[in-house]
């Protein structure tokens, strides 16, 4: 996952450099029972020390944030993480810290440190529950940890909060994926239909709808959907692959081979396509072609041991 730099952070961190002068000319001396007295030179000296310390802290805070954002630009996530943490240490009460925590959460999400990501996103949402990206990313983190219920709850809160269209689409995709995984394709289909209402040309949504149709027992409708998709997007590898896999499940391997042929022309570096075509060729008893495909997959990095079951079928 790509970690996005928050441009707003730059503006907010500059706020840390703003200080209001201490204009009061009197103090309440608590040590003397709350007596109101005029300021002395010692009071002014102490104020000056505090202001100097705050100014130094704020300069360090802005420096840490600037360097952290530059590190993100170089994809130096470990360095960015340390700099963001230093910024929080220097100015633990800075108004922009929720954005710093959000960035840390995104770093952890990108690194697969889902529990830590959830902690950071939760800190953001506790202070600013309206930050939709943090809620979506927490849902993704929950999903990756296998906590589908918590992921669904975050999706529900987000979708009920009238998010921006792009964020709504992402949440609907995640929700649809959870529904498919939990064997509720009718709910997934509803999610996908909403995505297509918002974004009629969304190719991934069309493919997911075909998957939901098949899961609902409507294999022919799913195939018709994929036929239309491939006709409209002949260079989409995922579309060719989805139709080939469905054709294999429908026991028409000769059609699957044609789709694998087209997909391999589009993505000759993808070993999974060669494995898929090998399976189809094995069903068609085309053993020479199947061996060539298996060998091609091995040449592309698939360990031969993982394909032993298919190589064994060549000897039958």
Region roles according to the model:
Residues 59-93, 99, 106-110, 177:
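Alpha-helical segment of the N-proximal tetratricopeptide repeat
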Residues 61, 95-99, 132-133, 165-169, ...:
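Helix-start (N-cap) detector for alpha-helical repeat units in TPR-like alpha-solenoids
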Residues 66, 99-103, 137, 170-174, ...:
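Canonical tetratricopeptide repeat
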Residues 73-74, 110, 144-145, 177, ...:
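Register position in tetratricopeptide repeats
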Residues 89-92, 122-126, 157-163, 193-197, ...:
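Conserved structural position within tetratricopeptide repeats
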């Amino acid at each position: 996952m790509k970690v996005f730099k928050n441009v707003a952070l730059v503006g907010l961190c500059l706020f840390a450099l703003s200080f209001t002068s201490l204009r009061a000319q009197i103090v309440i001396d608590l040590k003397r029972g709350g007596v109101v007295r005029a300021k002395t030179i010692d009071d002014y000296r102490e104020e000056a020390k505090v202001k100097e310390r705050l100014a130094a802290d704020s300069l360090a805070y802005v420096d840490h944030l600037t360097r952290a954002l530059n590190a993100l630009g170089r994809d130096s996530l470990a360095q960015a993480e340390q700099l963001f943490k230093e910024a929080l240490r220097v100015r633990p009460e800075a108004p922009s810290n929720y954005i710093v925590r959000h960035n840390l959460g995104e770093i952890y999400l990108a690194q697969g440190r889902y529990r830590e990501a959830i902690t950071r996103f939760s800190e953001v949402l506790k202070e600013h529950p309206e930050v939709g990206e943090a809620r979506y990313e927490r849902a993704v983190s929950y999903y990756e940890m296998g906590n589908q219920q918590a992921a669904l709850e975050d999706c529900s809160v987000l979708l009920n909060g009238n998010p921006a269209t792009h964020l709504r689409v992402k949440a609907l995709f995640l929700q649809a994926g959870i529904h498919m995984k939990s064997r509720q394709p009718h709910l997934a289909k509803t999610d996908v239909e909403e995505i297509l209402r918002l974004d009629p040309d969304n190719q991934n949504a069309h493919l997911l709808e075909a998957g939901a149709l098949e899961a609902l027992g409507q294999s022919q409708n799913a195939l018709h959907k994929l036929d239309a998709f491939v006709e409209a997007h002949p260079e989409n590898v995922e579309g060719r692959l989805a139709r080939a896999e469905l054709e294999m499940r429908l026991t028409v391997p000769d059609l699957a081979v044609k789709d694998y042929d087209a997909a391999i022309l589009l993505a000759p570096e993808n070993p999974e396509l060669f494995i898929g075509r090998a399976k189809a060729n094995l069903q068609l008893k085309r053993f020479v072609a199947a061996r060539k495909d298996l060998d091609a997959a091995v040449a592309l990095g698939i360990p031969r041991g993982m394909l032993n079951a298919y190589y064994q079928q060549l000897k039958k």
